[in-house]
Amino acid sequence: MTPKQYAYYSLNNLKEYKCLASLYGKESAWNHNAYNASSRAVGIPQGKSIWLLTATPIQQTEWGLRYIKHRYSTPCKAYDHWKAKGWH
């Protein structure tokens, strides 16, 4: 299973998946090795947890979904924040 498939099945909502796909597409291009030197964010969700450095792509996606749920409640709200501020 790919990280995109995992996210789609975890969300079970096409609208929310599209928001997440857009957000992660812009943040990391769904690259589990992505690294932002200026913010030190890593992985698919561009998180600042050192744990993400050794996590699998699926684990990174799961971490990102939990983060979004805790901070924004939905991927669409997280993506709206990203569009307004340039970060999430």
Regions found by a protein language model. Name each.
Residues 1-88:
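Peptidoglycan cell-wall recognition and remodeling modules
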